[in-house]
C-alpha cells in the first residue's frame, strides 16, 4: 500500500512562521524567542523575592516589556496564519473565465459531492445533453470526435496540390461515398453480382457452388469476414520480436454470446436481428418472406450454436492459460473440418505456408467443437451462414434502402433514434476507418502544433515518475519483483500524435501503393480496400513487428497500451480539449490527459499486462508471493465493481477488472504528478466563482471528462460487451478509493464517496 501525503493547507505548524518569502534572516523561531524572554528570570521563589525588591517604575517597565513581547508573538502568529492560509490569486483571463463557465454548466452544485460525485460533477451536463438523434450514447469523447470529423470533412473536400498520392486516394474514396446519385442508380446490383460470382446464395437464388472450403477461403481471404473463427497476424506474445499467425473464436452477428443464450432478456433484440436478416434478403432479391424467414431462422440458430461453444470474455483474462502454440499440421488434427493448408495459403498469398508453420491458438477446445459443429451441419446452411457474414459486412456500402434497414435494427439493438444524419458524417467515418493513415497527414498538419509532442512527452515523464514513486512504497510486492516492475516502467515506449512514416509522402505512398480507388464506385472501393488490407497483413507475417504500426489512426479520440511492444500510444485526436488545453490550469490538464496517460501506463501492470515483461514477452517474471498478493488486492476491486449496477443490471467486476485497475492507478499517478508539479512550480491561480481549490479542481476535471449519457439498450450492450465500467462508475469507483479525494472534499468517513474499506492495487 502506498504511503499517503498529509493534507495540504490543513492545520498549522507552530514551530516557525515565515514573513514573506523564505530566505536567510527571515525565519523567527518561537523556541528561541521564548528563551530570550526568560533571560534574567530566576526560579519562581527567587523571582518572588526579586519582584518585591523592585521599584514601582521597574515593575511598570517589566509589565510593559512583557506585554510588548506578547503582542509581538501575537502579531507574528497572525502573520504566519495569514501566510499559510492565504488564498491563491484568481485567474481572470478570457481562457479561465471560459473554462469556468463550461465547468459550472456541467455541474449540479445542489448535489453533495460526498454523496454522489458523478452527479455533482456532471448533473448539469446530463440535463443539457439528452442522447442526440442518430446516437445511442453521447459524451465528451463523442463531442470531440464530431469536432475532428468536421475538420476531416473540410480537408477531404478541399484538394491541395501538395497532397501525396495516398491522401488523394482517401479523397477519391470519400467522394465516391458522397456520390449518392450513383449509389442509388446501382441499388443492390454490386452485392448481387458479387454473390453470384461466389456461387450464389440459397436465400436469393439458385445455389450452384456446393464447396464449403472454396467459399470459406474466398469470403475470408478477399472480403475480410470471419465466419467460425478469426485469422490474423500479430506479434507472438512469447517471442515479441516475431509476428505469427493467430486463430481465435469469432463468427457471431450480435455483439456478445449473451444475446443468444439469455433469450428471454434479449427477445426484442433477437426478433429485431431476425427481421433485419429477412429485410436484407428481400432487398437482395430473395423473393417472398415465407421462403426467406425459415432459412434466416436457421442461420440464427446456427449462430446460437456457435454462441454456446464461445468462451465468455471474463474467462479469457489469463493469457498464460489461453496461449497455445501449435503447428499447421497439429491444427489440422485439432480441427479437421477445415483443410488448413489451402485455407492459410489463400489468406496469406504469396507467402508460402507449410505443415510446420507455427500458429498461436487462443482456445483449442473452441476450435475442436467448431470443427465438430461444421461436420454435423447441412452444407446449404453452412453456405447460407458464410454468405450472411459477407452480406452483413458489405450491405452498408449500398443504397438508402439498406441504410434504412441498418437504422431500424440499430434502433432495436442500441436504442438509436432514426434520423437523417448528414451523409458526410457516415462517409467521413468510413473513410477514416479504412484510410485513416492515408488522410492522417492532412489532419496532423491542421490540428497538431509542432511542440505538442514535446508537451505530451513532458506530461508522460511526470506521470511515469509519479507511478514509480508509488511503486516504491507498495507493501504487498517483494523487492525483486518491484525492481523488475520499475525496469518495465522505465522501458515503456511513448508514441505520440502519429506514426512517423505518414509525414513522409514517399513512405506513405509506398504503404498505399497497391490500393487504387475508383471515382464514383463506392462499393468497389470498399471491396478493394478489404482485399488490400489482407495483402498488407500477409506481408507482415515474415517481418518483425515495428513501432510505426499503430492500432489507431491519428484522428482517433482514444489511446492504448500494447503489451507486446510495451508502449503507450496517444493519437493526435485525443491531445485536445477537454483532455488538454494550453491555457487551462494544470489541475485540469493533469485531471484530463494526465489521467489518460496514467491509465494507459497502468495497463502495463493490470491483470493481463502484468504477465508481459519489459521486452513484451509473456512469461512468469513475478515471484509467487507477489502474484498471490496481487490477486488479493485485485479481488477487492472485483467485488467493489460487482456491487454497481445500471437499471438493475450488475456490472461484471471480473470482465472489467483490467480497465478498473487502470482507472484507479491512472488517477493516483496523475494526482501525485500534479502535486510534484506544484512543488516545483508553485501554486496555481484558482478559477473564479467556483470556490474550489486547485486540488479539488483536479478531481472535478477528471470526473467531467466522463460526463455521458446512454440509451437503456446501449447501457445493456455495454454491460455485457465493454471491458470498461460505465462512465458513472469509472468516476465513483476510482474516487471512492482515493484517500486524497476524501481529504480535499472533507467527506465524512463512511459516506458513499469515502467508504471505510477502500481498494488499492497500484
From Swiss-Prot:
List of glycosylated residues: 158, 179, 202, 262, 308, 354, 375, 531, 624, 643
Gene Ontology MF annotations: endopeptidase activity; identical protein binding; metalloendopeptidase activity; protein homodimerization activity; zinc ion binding
Record topological domains on the Cytoplasmic side: 1-60
GO (cellular component) term, any one: membrane
Enzyme Commission code: 3.4.24.71
Topology versus the membrane: Single-pass type II membrane protein
Record note on cofactor: Binds 1 zinc ion per subunit.
Pfam families associated with the record: Peptidase_M13 (PF01431), Peptidase_M13_N (PF05649)
Record topological domains on the Extracellular side: 82-762
Job of this protein: Converts big endothelin-1 to endothelin-1.
Protein name (record): Endothelin-converting enzyme 1
Native organism: Rattus norvegicus
Organismal lineage: Eukaryota, Metazoa, Chordata, Craniata, Vertebrata
